[in-house]
Amino acid sequence: MKTNWNYPTSLWVGENRVKDLTLACQNLKIKKPLFVTDKDLINLPIVKNIISELENSFNQINIFSNFSGNPIGENVDEGVNEFKKFQCDGVIAFGGGSGLDVGKAIAFMSGQSRKIWDFEDIGDYWKRADQKNIAPIIAVPTTAGTGSETGRASAIINSETKIKKIIFHPKFLPSIVILDPVLTLDLSPRLTAATGMDALAHNLEAFCAPGFHPMADGIAIEGIRLTKKSLMTAVKDG
């Protein structure tokens, strides 16, 4: 059996690593970032503090937050318009699955002339993309469940058909991911439980998939072990 493995995403892990957002932007030569997060997170004190720190480093921080869970194509279009209006050169995608998916899609679509649905994960549709103008992405997840921060796709709903589509391109993959456990502490017990079960489901799916590789199984089993060990405590104590 022949397989290829790579882990191209740079992961910055640890408590309060979110304070390194400015450094992450500098590493990617981002001078005018678009901060993308959903309307439920934008007014939280911790998010306001992060934006305030970014404002100390950049002349201006442009924010796009006009979306909630299960984003639609029009949300991405509006975000792309904001990206171009303010002449941004990179995206900070902040939040749970929706914030990450929308941020990644905005960075990707900012360099495209086709509709987003032309890049659905079907065959070689991804080869239609203009790869030269895809903006760099920094992902900052606030939940443990989706894994979107290391994924090459976004889940976006087509509002006309009411069907959720998977939009794919290798460059959907963020260049830097900041994994700061402090950002998960304010989640409600219900959301902590739901995203924890999502993480468990991803690991079970990987372990039970027909294709086998010992590295994948090892990662999946360790993920299951960690979920069993810590999820109940996280739900109870944050």
Where are these regions (language model features)?
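Glycine-rich nucleotide phosphate-binding loop and flanking beta-alpha elements
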Residues: 19, 98, 144-146, 185, ...
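Catalytic cores of large soluble enzymes that bind and process phosphate-bearing ligands
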Residues: 10-13, 42, 68-71, 98, ...
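ATP/NTP phosphate-donor binding region
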Residues: 1-90
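Predominant activation on well-ordered alpha-helical scaffold segments within soluble catalytic domains
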Residues: 22, 51, 62, 77-80, ...
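Carboxylate- and glycine-rich phosphate/diphosphate-binding segment that chelates Mg2+/Mn2+
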Residues: 153-238
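Ser/Thr-centric signal marking residues that sit
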Residues: 9, 37, 142-146, 150, ...
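Glycine/threonine-rich beta-strand-loop-alpha-helix active-site module
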Residues: 74-181
